[in-house]
Amino acid sequence: MLAEKKECYEKTGKNLKVTPAKYKAEFPWLKEVDSLALCNAQRHLQIAYKNFFRDPSFGFPRFKSKKNPVKSYTTNSVNGNILLKDGKLKLPKAGWIRIRQHRKIREDACLKGASVCMEADGRYYVSLLYFCEEKPVEIRNIRQAVGLDFSMKELYVDSNGKHAGYPHYFRNSEEKLAKAQRKLSHCRKGSNRYKKQQKKVARIHTHIAHQRKDYLHKESRKITNFYDIVCIEDLDLKTMSGEHHFGKSVHDNGWRMFTDFLQYKLEREGKKLVRIDRWYPSSRTCSCCGKIKHDLKLEERVYLCNCGNRMDRDENAAINICREGLRISGIILEKSEKAS
C-alpha cells in the first residue's frame, strides 16, 4: 500500500486511492485472514498521510522495521464476530481463545473493536474498544489542593511534606537484567538459544514495566481520592532525559505516565490538574517570604533563606507550585484548607 501510494505521488503528485479488494485479487492469501484487518491497515495509512500533510512534524509514513516489527492488527465488531464470554474471546478467523481478563466490562458498554498484538516477550495481548455513555461530571467544590514537585529520587514530593518513596523498579532489577543480557551476548545470533534468551530478557523488561504501571496507578488513585486540585510543573522531560546524570532516573520514574494517569482520574471525578510554567522559579523562591535565591545550586538539597526559613528544597518548591497553580487558575481556598 505505502509503496504504491509513494510511487504514485512522486510521479503524478496525486494521492492514490485503492480498496482492499484490489490487493486480495493480486494476493489471494490475504483472503485467509480477517478482512477487516486489511481495511484497518489501509485506514491507519490514510490517517498517517493526513497527519503528515496537516503537520510535517509527524513525519512521512514509513515501512515497518524488519528488525523490530510491530506484530499487531486491529479489527471491528460486526454482526457478533467478536464475543467475550466465560473467560474466552472469539475473534474473526481465529475462533474462541482462552484469555486472562483483568477487569469486568460494564453492562451498558457496546463492543466496537479489538486490537491484538504480540509483545517482545512472546505473549499476546488484546485491547477491546467499548463505547459507553458517560454522564457529565459536575465540577466539585474545591476544598483540598496540593502541589507536586518532580523528584529524581522520590518521583515526587508534595506540598504537605510527603515523599512518594518510589521503589525504582528498573534499578532494583539491573543486576538480574545484566546477567540475562550477558547470557544473550554469548548466544549465536539467530539461533534457537538466542531467540529463547531474547524472550527472557524481554520478560524482565515487561515485568519492570508492569510493576511501574501498577505503582503509578495506585499512587495517582490515592491523590485523586484525597485532593480536588493538583498542581504540577510542565516539565521538558525529553531534554531532562538527555542529560548524562538524569536519563536513567527520568525513564525509571515514569513521571509523564504518572501525570497522564492523574489527569484522566481527576477529570472523571470533576477535579482539576493544573500545570504551571516550567520556567517558574519554584525551587529558588522562598515559600515563607517570597524572596528569590538566584544563586541556588542543584547540589543544595536544603533551602536556606535569610528570613529564617530552613526546609527540604523539594518541599519548598512543591508549596510554591501549589500557590502558583491556585493563582493562575483563579481559585481561592480558605487558609486552613491550603496545602502549606
For each predicted feature, which ranges?
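Nucleic-acid substrate recognition interfaces
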Residues: 1-340
